[in-house]
Amino acid sequence: MNNSINHKFHHISRAEYQELLAVSRGDAVADYIIDNVSILDLINGGEISGPIVIKGRYIAGVGAEYTDAPALQRIDARGATAVPGFIDAHLHIESSMMTPVTFETATLPRGLTTVICDPHEIVNVMGEAGFAWFARCAEQARQNQYLQVSSCVPALEGCDVNGASFTLEQMLAWRDHPQVTGLAEMMDYPGVISGQNALLDKLDAFRHLTLDGHCPGLGGKELNAYIAAGIENCHESYQLEEGRRKLQLGMSLMIREGSAARNLNALATLINEFNSPQCMLCTDDRNPWEIAHEGHIDALIRRLIEQHNVPLHVAYRVASWSTARHFGLNHLGLLAPGKQADIVLLSDARKVTVQQVLVKGEPIDAQTLQAEESARLAQSAPPYGNTIDRQPVSASDFALQFTPGKRYRVIEAIHNELITHSRSSVYSENGFDRDDVCFIAVLERYGQRLAPACGLLGGFGLNEGALAATVSHDSHNIVVIGRSAEEMALAVNQVIQDGGGLCVVRNGQVQSHLPLPIAGLMSTDTAQSLAEQIDALKAAARECGPLPDEPFIQMAFLSLPVIPALKLTSQGLFDGEKFAFTTLEVTE
């Protein structure tokens, strides 16, 4: 666990110190004082009464001794409870389909003042240019947008075609950037465990920062070896004992509740007073519809309190201080003298009802954020341009030949989980022996002119129609599932025509589609418009059968080879437990 102060993130000049100390002593006027407020004590439990005094970006003092202190402006909290700004310990903003600018507009008013982001989605498509854009957005954001340098581009060497590489030399060029907190999730855990020098070189280069992990279901000697390499955390745990063992071995546990991967219920009972400094909250992938209707980290805190009886100070601790401490962000995570004034005022702390947000000492106005969004996005110089280098397809491209009596491998989806199971199904003249089997294909979109990789999918709930998307982790080729080759081709051609996006086809017609013009991953629409379009997509998808809650997000992970057990990449069917390609027909 990285508990050291990373001085790179705590810039304060001597003049600022003198001004801050003068206000703390009571010798100078504060910029803001928040009155009529109780501060939730994340360290001891309980509450602290009294004002919060702010000078510039920082808290100058807390407590009743400042009741009569002078200020340029006073904020009446009207009896609210103050907590530190929320921190998402691990996410890919691209998976929200929003730009970093739009994401800030959607989440900052909900109390999300800090994010630790791995932009490996856009880096897989555009390489260093994608990372550079995220850095520009982070530099101009009010929200604290920190970046982990993407470590595995592609996710697993030799297993898929992606749009770009991100070499160690390129990674090192960003290591000392003021918004960089460390090395992003090291997904090639077999390579780390076996001691591959190229991976150890990356770990060594970032060892003074935070090293993110990714090891779903890993245990035994392999888990020990992975941690021994220096990996400090994992957000992929989905079983109670798995999470407990990682904590026992010194890993910090990121409890994830995204739109597809929902692990909070399985892991929440692990959180207690003793281990909460080692526990954090993250979303990984959460779409704008859920953010608008349920919330972001605020939704996770609410569930910890209401459904899992986690004490208030512990729930808010894992949503702020624990994460700040883990990443060496010593200026964040507490409402205390000298800390950055990232403050969330709650009219109801148990329901996480956000009344007002301050970040870097300034109150946030949601309407102002919305009004400035277009100009700030333009200022960031987004990397526009068509990233889909693929000719239209026909139904014959998805033709598969099956022999009666033969057994074939089927990817079995598990609703609301990223892992899949591997099963087999026997083909007869009447079709497969289970009626949930549909077709899946992955088409590379980077000009390699490869034929589609085709396979079988079960458990997804698709009874008719087809879904296609250019969001398919982590290489972001085109993934399509369907009941007929004709409708699969129609869906694929729509997302090609759109320059990337999502599409639902049913009854031989496009029912709904969403263009994603930035890297085939993100829209430039507002969060509200995106939420409405996603609502329409989900409604159209529901007509195709009893699909997962978030069908497109879950579909996007069917091509990610670093999460078990059976996946399909542009290169073919991949066994995520043996870390090797396998055949569609079972011949063993």
Swiss-Prot record:
E.C. code: 3.5.4.2
Signal peptide: none
Gene3D superfamilies (UniProt xref): Metal-dependent hydrolases, Urease, subunit C, domain 1
Cofactor(s) recorded in Swiss-Prot or TrEMBL: Mn(2+)
Superkingdom classification of source: Bacteria
Keyword Manganese applies: yes
MF terms in GO: adenine deaminase activity
Subunit structure and binding partners: Homodimer.
Family: Belongs to the metallo-dependent hydrolases superfamily. Adenine deaminase family.
Record-given protein name: Adenine deaminase
Taxonomic lineage from the root: Bacteria, Pseudomonadati, Pseudomonadota, Gammaproteobacteria, Enterobacterales
